[in-house]
Design a protein with these regions (language model features):
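C-terminal catalytic/motor cores of large multi-domain enzyme assemblies
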Residues: 1-138
């Protein structure tokens, strides 16, 4: 899958695309994402580096935004909105209360392209991997 990452620039927004993301390691994805974001900010992206893509990720959490709904940018079929990680009280399985880091994720899908149930499965998997990052190393 080709994944677009929203990058704020001085005059607006670019969505550079990481090609064949599913075939890359987490460290390779991170490196490529940083390189593309820097190219976007320095206005050195080539058209083939921001055109296309099927899925977008927008992280306003880095600006302290807790929760938001992102708008799908065609031709993408879905976009994941990532909110800030905040310390919040949670109830553990043994009914004790603890402070934990919690973040919000909101997935918007174009139902002409992606069935809502498939979107829900995607959210389950994203949540599973974020709650237990060691699974991403396998």
């Amino acid at each position: 899958s080709d994944i677009a990452i929203a990058v704020a620039v001085e005059d607006g927004l670019f969505t550079p695309v990481i090609r064949d993301a599913e075939a890359k390691s987490l460290s390779k994805l991170s490196k490529e994402m940083k390189e593309l974001a820097e190219k976007a900010r320095s206005k050195k992206l080539m058209p083939n580096e921001y055109q296309g893509g099927s899925f977008s990720i927008s992280n306003l959490g880095m600006f302290g935004i807790d929760n938001f709904d992102a708008v799908i940018n065609p031709p993408h079929g879905a976009i994941l909105a990532v909110g800030a990680g905040l310390k919040k009280p949670i109830v553990n399985e043994d009914n004790t209360i603890a402070v934990s880091n919690v973040m919000s994720l909101t997935l918007s899908v174009d139902h002409r392209v992606i069935d809502g149930a498939l979107g829900a499965e995607l959210m389950q998997n994203i949540t599973k991997y974020l709650e237990d990052p060691v699974l991403m190393m396998a």
